[in-house]
């Protein structure tokens, strides 16, 4: 796909407040994410996410994030929240991820104890997850959660992917311009980079992040 014909999509993850969701919509963010992974400080209950979903602007995707949740837990979220996209950060295989009849993203851990450049090759990923809508490369280690605020070496991203990919892990308004110019992702996913505290977003950081993404897009088009 010709990257120059596309703008960088933006996903704000770890949403816990309706006001933050409304602001994300006003800023033109493409997707907001609710976290249902056990142990996450940004975890919300399905009923809470359902209530906050009402604040979502039209044409903004609602993403449900899981990490080794049971099939019953995922089904409850799908039924209660009605997300448009699922995101899996654990050891879930393709059969599990696609069993909910919704498009899904598969996260690839790129932390120091995660996959190395040899393991994270496009062929292996696409053979393992042939039905994924795309991949998300994050800085956490296998079995760990995102939102750490740490980056990884972007040069380790696999080449030759035939699916869109999102870049995550330690991205904020100070480095997202360089991240986009360096990696040309289909989208960027941010949580801690626009926060005051886990789950509590900062309006100024949200605005600045979006501005920097748009600046990078204009740079790529010039």
From Swiss-Prot:
InterPro entries: Aldolase_TIM, PRAI_dom, RibuloseP-bd_barrel, TrpF_fam. Pathway: Amino-acid biosynthesis; L-tryptophan biosynthesis; L-tryptophan from chorismate: step 3/5. Keywords: Amino-acid biosynthesis, Aromatic amino acid biosynthesis, Isomerase, Tryptophan biosynthesis. PANTHER family: N-(5'-PHOSPHORIBOSYL)ANTHRANILATE ISOMERASE. It catalyses: N-(5-phospho-beta-D-ribosyl)anthranilate = 1-(2-carboxyphenylamino)-1-deoxy-D-ribulose 5-phosphate. HAMAP family: PRAI. It holds the Pfam family PRAI. GO terms for molecular function: phosphoribosylanthranilate isomerase activity. CDD domains: PRAI (cd00405). Its EC number is 5.3.1.24. The lineage of its organism: Bacteria, Pseudomonadati, Pseudomonadota, Gammaproteobacteria, Lysobacterales. SUPFAM superfamilies: Ribulose-phoshate binding barrel. One of its GO terms (biological process) is L-tryptophan biosynthetic process. Belongs to the TrpF family. Transmembrane segments: none annotated. The gene is trpF. It is an enzyme of class 5 (isomerase). This is N-(5'-phosphoribosyl)anthranilate isomerase. Disulfide bonds: none annotated.
